[in-house]
Amino acid sequence: CTFCDHFQGYVEGFRTMQVDQIIDEIRFLQNKYNTRYFHFTDESYPPALFRKLSQRIVEEKLDIVWTTHMRFEETLLDEQVWKDAHASGCRYLHFGFESGNQRVLKLMDKATKLDAIETNLRMSSEAGIWNHIMGFFGFPGEKKEEAEDSKHFVLKNREHVHSLGFMTYVLGKYSPVAFEPEKYGVSYYK
């Protein structure tokens, strides 16, 4: 996404663990710390892994409660995915919502469509998962009425938005916006 500079912290060779490795790690941590509670710290949990790991946790009867960070995905428009996630112990998801305006999402290079966001929120909520959405106002090029669209989106979907965190846009030093400020109408002053 054009606002993000997380990729600067990744070193060459970063990779996602395979499902079998994750299952082994969960068992190890359960035994070592006598815990059922897990936070998978991936700022954008891959949809295929979300689907596969949820199913495996159920199959392995791990009896855990877990959370992670997700993007809204068109590949997750299947109610069974959310039922499996809940059955596996998923109880809370942090979603990168960013904006309730399609044009602004496109400026941010987010492939997400607003109808997919609504569907993901509804399905996960109906499955019993708490939804926390994160967004911000003031992205370069966003108009006042487009910022209002975010408020209206949240109000329209309040039955399925359980908590939220909004802030003002902060230009990250290594974000694509910082690398190409003129493309986004950003100018530096000294």
Name each model-derived stretch.
Residues 1-18:
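Canonical Radical SAM [4Fe-4S] cluster-binding loop centered on the CxxxCxxC motif
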Residues 5, 38-41, 66, 133-135:
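Short beta-strands and strand-loop turn motifs
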Residues 6, 40-42, 95, 166:
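Conserved beta-strand positions
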Residues 16, 58-190:
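A structural motif corresponding to the C-terminal lobe/cap of the Radical SAM core domain
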Residues 25-42:
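Short Fe-S-cluster ligation motifs
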Residues 25-29, 53, 120, 150:
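Alpha-helical packing segments of well-folded alpha/beta enzyme cores
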Residues 47-50:
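Active-site-adjacent beta->alpha loops and helix N-cap segments on the catalytic face
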